[in-house]
Every structure is written in C-alpha cells, then in structure tokens.
Amino acid sequence: MTTSAPPLVLLVEDDHGVRRPLEKFLQMHHFEVVTAETADDAIDAIHLHHPLAAIIDLRLARGSGRDVVVSMPAGTPVIIFSGVPSESAELERLRPRTRLVQKPYSLTMLVEELKEMISSAKLSQH
C-alpha cells in the first residue's frame, strides 16, 4: 500500500504572528508547508521546492507579494491574502487559478478553498 506525500504549499507572510499559526493549522490538515517572509525568499522557494499551491500576502515588508504571484508557474493554484480587495482583483482576473481571500479570513474556509483548488488543478492535468 502506498500513500501519497502531503501537498506542498508555499506560505508567504511577513508577520510571524500570522505565519506561524497558519503554518501549524495547514500542517494539522495534512499539508507540507514551506514558508517565506520576503518576496525574494518566496521566489527562491518556488524554484527550489516547486510547491503545488501557494498562499501569498500581497503586502510584505520587504518586496511585493505581487512579484511572487507572477513568479508562480502557470496553472499553480494561488490564494492571495489582502485587506484591500482592489489590490488583488487584477491579479485574480489575469492569472488563472488565483483566488482572493480578504482579511480577516476563516482558517477552515482557507483550507477548504486550498483543497478544492489543488484538486481542480490535479484534475485538469490529466
């Protein structure tokens, strides 16, 4: 009997008080998580780890989450955090498999959205 590895998710959030609990919550829901605090670190993580999906805060202290979003491979599911919906609306329209989650957000809803997006992406690859 073989078991598949948990889906690898890139979490880009510069606020430790948000990033750490979200990372733990995702791990509790059977995701493997790679974290990054800056846009540069996130872009490096994309190339190094090839995540199956990403959760990205648009407003980072160092760099722009927007740069991370456009660096994700086409077809990779991306959830964008934003307190300002107009910031991410353009990215959501331009990039397939991108969804906006407005702050504040429900962790349960976030995980369900992530699972649905990953499942949909896997189905479209076959």
Protein language model annotation of sequence segments:
Residues 57-72, 85:
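Conserved phosphotransfer microenvironments
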